[in-house]
Regions:
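Residue-level detector of functionally pivotal "anchor" positions at catalytic/ligand-binding pockets or at interdomain
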Residues: 296-315, 319
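C-terminal tail/sorting-segment detector
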Residues: 332-345
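Negatively charged
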Residues: 1-298
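Extracellular Ig-like/FN3 beta-sandwich strand-entry sites
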Residues: 328-330
């Protein structure tokens, strides 16, 4: 057990451990935590085949600029909670050798790594991870992040996952499985340079909190939330607060929520079924009929019909029942020119 072994050695500027035998060590929890003066650490000699927890191992090493953990064996590690939390001066991390198959907790793993500009996670196996909240919180210098290999099928908490990634211009979460996620509070809050986000596939059926989810996403001009039903959400407060360049939010659903204070505040360019009104900024405007949402037309469906060329002769529902007028949603129509097509009302 090496738990907190060198923890809080606040004036320790140099540490050399080349002869440490660590092959039977099970816990390295907080081993170097809060060594605020340490600038360089070479742990390339560490053999860690039995270690199960690296929770907070380097947490608070705020002066650390060089860290060699290239030979770490993490095959048995289950807990990486806050492992590099507040390593504020660390410019790069290459964890491409990490085996994370058994890890269940990555809460705040890289939070407050403010100087981090390069982060390699290509080998990360995250299929058993349940908590990714605050994982990249305040990685304010990180310009890009490759999460294409992330398996999030068991994640329940993504709260503040990318919050205050101030320099991030693009985050590819197109492969995220969010079926079990309950918390998305502040997930992209303060991501001021992101110009696009593909969330069209997100499953939000179990989400209960989206408060400040897109707070101050200053560069976003549109969002496709067409899959967002949010039927279980109880807090949508400030969800789109200060999305100053936002013009269009695509969503076909009407949202309802108990708490929605300032939901659309300072979104002056937003327009959906109606133009933006600074006096109407709560969940009552979260709909595509009388609110700020715009309906997303499915591929292959005509949004409207040019009645100057052809007129609607017959209208049918998707189950083949004849209708007297266009219904909300998808309609099958026969035109006066004989053409059969689908249109969305």
């Amino acid at each position: 057990d090496m738990t907190s072994m060198f923890s809080a050695c606040t004036v320790l500027a140099e540490l050399k451990v080349p002869n440490f035998n660590t092959e039977k060590v099970v816990s390295m929890f907080g081993m170097f935590a809060n060594n605020k003066a340490l600038t360089s650490l070479d742990l390339s000699s560490f053999n860690t085949p039995e270690v199960t927890t690296m929770k907070g191992m380097f947490s608070g090493c705020s002066a650390l600029t060089s860290l060699n953990i290239s030979n770490f064996n993490t095959a048995k590690v289950t807990d990486m909670y806050g492992m590099f939390f507040s390593c504020e001066a660390l410019p790069s991390l290459d964890l491409s050798n990490f085996d994370t198959e058994k890890v269940t907790d990555m809460y705040g793993m890289f939070a407050y790594c403010k100087a981090l500009k390069s982060l390699k996670l290509s080998s990360f196996d995250t299929k058993n991870v349940k908590n990714m909240s605050f994982m990249f919180f305040y990685c304010s210098s990180l310009p890009t992040l490759d999460l294409s290999g992330f398996n999030t099928e068991n994640v329940t908490d993504m709260g503040a996952m990318f919050k205050y990634c101030l320099e991030m211009e693009k985050i590819d979460v197109s492969k995220f499985n969010t079926e079990k996620v309950t918390n998305m509070r502040g997930m992209f809050s303060g991501c001021r340079k992101i110009t696009s986000l593909d969330l069209s596939h997100f499953n939000t059926e179990n989400v209960t909190n989206t408060n400040t989810m897109f707070f101050s996403c200053d560069a976003l001009t549109s969002l496709n939330l067409s899959s967002f039903k949010l039927e279980k959400v109880t807090d949508m407060g400030s969800m789109f607060f200060a999305c100053e360049e936002m013009k269009t939010i695509y969503c076909n659903y009407t949202w309802k929520c108990a708490e929605s204070t300032s939901m659309f505040a300072y979104c002056s360019k937003l327009k959906g079924a109606v133009a933006y009104d600074e006096n109407k900024v709560d969940v009552q405007m979260a709909n595509p009929e009388t609110g700020y949402f715009t309906k997303k037309t499915p591929s292959g469906i005509e949004k409207s019909v040019d009645t100057t060329e052809a007129k609607i002769v017959d209208i049918y529902s998707l189950d083949g029942k004849k209708q007297t007028e266009l219904q909300n949603g998808v309609n099958i129509v026969r035109m006066s020119n004989g053409k059969i097509q689908k249109i969305m009302k």
